[in-house]
């Protein structure tokens, strides 16, 4: 199915899309966190960020004169054997006169601080925007209308037009910027450094543990209902539900890795964000009915457009390159997982031939062999490790919580 509607070519500039959703409150908060999500360096020891534009995140609630502040470096670590391990730095934005460097004037030199301002901003003024209380307000997604950071940095894509339930507080009850629930913000903060592809699989596992476990009968029903209504249950391969992958015709999406892992492949969850809903498919498609000997065939042609300035544009392109006509291939960065702990049970009579009647010498296990067995991971340990992968690996695709849409799961 191809995926809004196609339009003719034009030389006119691309339209500016005005995004809705939660906005930073107009009145300052008593918290101490940045209003915005972090910029994340792609490599260790990356230089401070440089910006194509002003470097000030979009916030339409502030006057132009107030559009100035600083980016502050935050060292990050992940746990590991023998202690913590450094991962690439994060940079957080604060308005002048707020945050950890509230005592500095705009432009004062200090290590780990990068000052930015919009054209026409009054950098001698100090902001009354305050900082964020994480218990009341969620992070606001970064948007740069005049150009973002250089290629050494990235940020997780969080859409701001996805409806979520709000948390009623005195500070936000009268504002249109009511924040998502505390549980939602806690989940984003605690997993902000995890690889999103791994987190996609973890969310499915967590949902099953919390009472939404799919029974064998339910999974079988999901996989064998009417073809156009099927969904892939956990533990099923793609071809078990939708048939073998092909090239150049229907059923051409998915490489061998995706076929084997099914819904556990985080790329599936990410791409579901681009798939039209049933209503969008029906009312936003070009519908072509055709009578055939076996019945009525309905063809739906729908086009989903991912803007080139979307922070995840390159990632979506990469997945399409891997998975469209991807049968017989695997991602280049798909490394084999560690083997599970070998089963040390002795063979039973039913599983092995009777031994010869001779005395066998006992093999003495070396200490090195014992150590290797101890270091082998159980399947549970492998799964936990996969959930703890951080975004400092150069080939890891990071999606942001937006890739894990509630409706798609």
UniProtKB/Swiss-Prot annotation:
The keyword Transcription applies. Disulfide bonds join 320-323. SUPFAM superfamilies: Coronavirus RNA-binding domain, Nucleocapsid protein dimerization domain. It comes from the Viruses. Residues 180-192, 368-384 have a biased composition (Basic and acidic residues). Belongs to the gammacoronavirus nucleocapsid protein family. This is Nucleoprotein.
């Amino acid at each position: 199915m191809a995926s809004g509607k196609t339009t003719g070519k034009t030389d006119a500039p691309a339209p500016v899309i005005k995004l809705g959703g939660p906005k930073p409150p107009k009145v300052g908060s008593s918290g101490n966190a940045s209003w915005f999500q972090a910029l994340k360096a792609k490599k260790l020891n990356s230089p401070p960020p440089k910006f194509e534009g002003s470097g000030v995140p979009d916030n339409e609630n502030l006057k132009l004169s107030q559009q100035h502040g600083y980016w502050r470096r935050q060292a990050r670590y992940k746990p590991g054997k023998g202690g913590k391990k450094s991962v690439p730095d994060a940079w957080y934005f604060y308005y002048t006169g707020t945050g950890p460097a509230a005592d500095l004037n705009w432009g004062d030199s200090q290590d780990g601080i990068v000052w930015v301002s919009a054209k026409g901003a009054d950098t001698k003024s100090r902001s009354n925007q305050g900082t964020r209380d994480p218990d009341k307000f969620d992070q606001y997604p970064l948007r740069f209308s005049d150009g973002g950071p250089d290629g050494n940095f990235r940020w997780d894509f969080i859409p701001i037009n996805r409806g979520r339930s709000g948390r009623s507080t005195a500070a936000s009850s009268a504002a249109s910027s009511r924040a998502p629930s505390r549980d939602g913000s806690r989940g984003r903060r605690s997993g902000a450094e995890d690889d999103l592809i791994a987190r996609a699989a973890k969310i499915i596992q967590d949902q099953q543990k919390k009472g939404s476990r799919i029974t064998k009968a339910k999974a079988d029903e999901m996989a064998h209902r009417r073809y156009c209504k099927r969904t892939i249950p956990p533990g099923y391969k793609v071809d078990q539900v939708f048939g073998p992958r092909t090239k150049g015709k229907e059923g051409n999406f998915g490489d061998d890795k995706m076929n084997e892992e099914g819904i556990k492949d985080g790329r599936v969850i990410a791409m579901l964000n681009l798939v039209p809903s049933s209503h969008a498919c029906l009312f936003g498609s070009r519908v072509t009915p055709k009578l055939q000997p076996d019945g009525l065939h309905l063809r739906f042609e729908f086009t989903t457009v991912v803007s080139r300035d979307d922070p995840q544009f390159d990632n979506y392109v990469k997945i399409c390159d891997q998975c469209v006509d991807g049968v017989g291939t695997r991602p280049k960065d798909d490394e084999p997982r560690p083997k599970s702990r070998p089963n040390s049970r002795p063979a039973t009579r039913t599983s092995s031939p009777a031994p010869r009647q001779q005395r066998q010498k006992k093999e003495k296990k070396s200490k090195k062999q014992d150590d290797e067995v101890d270091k082998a991971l159980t399947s549970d340990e492998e799964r936990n490790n996969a959930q703890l992968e951080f975004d400092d690996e150069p080939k890891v695709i990071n999606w942001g919580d937006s890739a894990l849409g509630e409706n798609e799961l």
